[in-house]
Regions:
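N-terminal alpha-helical "arm" segments
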Residues: 1-31
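Aromatic/basic-lined ligand-recognition segments
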Residues: 15, 21-24, 32, 36, ...
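Short acidic, glycine/tyrosine-flanked loop/strand segments centered on an H-E-D-like triad
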Residues: 94-119, 408-411, 416, 423-429
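Compact, glycine/acidic-enriched structural inserts
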Residues: 111-146
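Residues that cap or initiate secondary-structure elements
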Residues: 115-117, 196, 371
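A generic structural micro-environment signature
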Residues: 119, 156-158, 175, 421, ...
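Short, surface-exposed linear patches
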Residues: 132-133, 211-214, 387
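Long C-terminal appendages of very large multidomain proteins
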Residues: 265-432
Length: 432
């Protein structure tokens, strides 16, 4: 019996008269790769989600891939989900769309885990991981795209002391896109990464780091996750760091939006009393189009250390490249940083003369060239690494416009502001 409302059972093909063409299409794609495994091990929901069960994915098939020594591909376990797309065509989970349209969310997730010598059977924790990601997608409606990064902040297996604690989203190198009678889908592969690899993906682009990972034999062209890997690709091959830095200089960063621990407050309000209450009230504004944008004299921005770690990259690789950046928090507050090149675009209501305006819980800040130069210089200290622990809170002051930025240790802003209940799933989404 697997955890999380799943059980392990031998694969049972669907009777022909059931005619579940979405499920059958995935089966055929898998059989083309694994013709010797027509009946793979399968994790299946004890009670399907459409019958009220807690597990969103109906099935996860698990194959043994024997690898390819010539290509540097090790033996590994290949996990393939069933449930993000329309499996049945009868509307029980996803509305029917038809050929040429997205089937359900338009993708299934896969995961490749290196087989260890001690493995007598495939580990089952990846099935729980895929279901957690499915819960996020089903509850929020936010899809996982190629190049997206998923900060996780703990070993993916939740038991070891592995440094593989985050994820990137690649395309499965072997499973093709499908056009089924119930719609189209592609297979997007979850790839476990280290903190260094995650930071590089955030600073540049997830797709670029994924391409670099394929060149390193410890990961290879099939993007194998090895929970025993102890070094990042940038430690294995220092030349890859130079490629990322060159990419940032040439392209900027593709990271345009992140959900993080952050907060904005009218600078004229007290953070401890009126400001926090005002934040709660404005956070209730769901229909922003009914509220006229209002001008602020100054704004107080609060970030935890993890979110603040992005500020230098945002200034140099986004805003100074003419690209916007959007912070979003768990209370539906948004901080939209807008460079001069984006002023005047549809939906932008700030400019040089009115640089600070808000609409409900949505804040826009016009970042002039002079402000960006100051930010680039001031935020340099956030990237300095030495043996001394930074002193918190850290403050940055800007006068044109009036902006106070306070950085708190990771986890402390959440407790002090008390504006997030439960675990925050911080998901970064790349700009397409």
């Amino acid at each position: 019996m697997a955890t999380g409302g799943e059980e392990i059972e031998p694969y049972e093909s669907v009777p022909d008269d059931w005619n579940y063409l979405g499920l059958e299409s995935i089966d055929k794609a898998c059989f083309a790769i694994y013709p010797d495994q027509p009946n793979p091990l399968q994790a299946t929901a004890v009670i399907k989600s459409w019958l009220g069960g807690p597990v969103p994915l109906d099935y996860i098939s698990i194959y043994q891939n024997n690898g390819d020594p010539v290509r540097g591909v090790p033996t590994h376990w290949h996990y393939i989900s069933y449930g993000f797309t329309d499996l049945y065509g009868d509307g029980r989970i996803h509305a029917f769309s038809g050929p040429g349209q997205l089937s359900g969310f338009g993708f299934e997730l896969t995961f490749r885990l290196k087989k260890q010598e001690s493995d007598d059977a495939p580990p089952m924790w990846p099935t729980a991981l895929l279901n957690k990601l499915a819960n996020y997608v089903f509850k929020t409606g936010n899809m996982l795209h190629y190049g997206d990064h998923i900060p996780w902040h703990k070993p993916l297996d939740e038991e070891s002391e592995s440094c593989i604690q985050h994820m990137l989203v690649a395309l499965d190198p072997e499973l093709p896109s499908l056009d089924t009678p119930y719609g189209t889908l592609e297979f997007r592969q979850i790839v476990g990464v280290t903190s260094d690899e995650m930071k590089m993906a955030q600073k540049w682009k997830g797709a670029g780091v994924i391409e670099l990972m394929a060149t390193v034999k410890e990961i290879g062209p099939l993007y194998i996750t090895d929970m025993q890997r102890s070094e990042s690709i940038f430690q294995i091959d220092p030349n890859l760091t130079h490629q990322v830095l060159e990419g940032i200089n040439n392209d900027g960063s593709n990271l345009g939006h992140v959900t993080a621990v952050c907060l904005w407050i009218d600078i004229n309000m007290s953070y401890q009393s009126e400001g926090l209450e005002a934040q709660r009230v404005t956070g209730l504004t769901d229909r922003m189009e009914e509220v006229e944008p209002q001008t602020l004299e100054g704004v107080h921005l609060l970030f935890d250390a993890e979110a603040a770690d992005l500020l230098l990259m945002i200034a140099r690789a986004r805003l100074m490249k003419g690209k916007y950046f959007l912070f979003h928090n768990a209370n539906n507050q948004s901080i939209h940083l807008i460079p001069p090149d984006c002023a005047g675009e549809e939906g932008i209501f700030v400019n040089q003369s009115e640089p600070l305006k808000f609409q409900g819980s949505y804040l826009q800040i016009y970042c002039s060239e002079s402000l960006l130069e100051q930010m680039s210089a001031e935020f340099e200290v956030l990237q300095q690494s030495n043996n001394e622990m930074p002193v918190y809170p850290r403050e940055f002051h800007f006068s044109e416009p009036t902006i106070l930025i306070t950085v708190w240790p990771q986890g402390q802003l959440m407790m002090d502001a008390n504006y997030v209940s439960g675990e925050l799933d911080m998901t970064a989404v790349t700009e397409t």
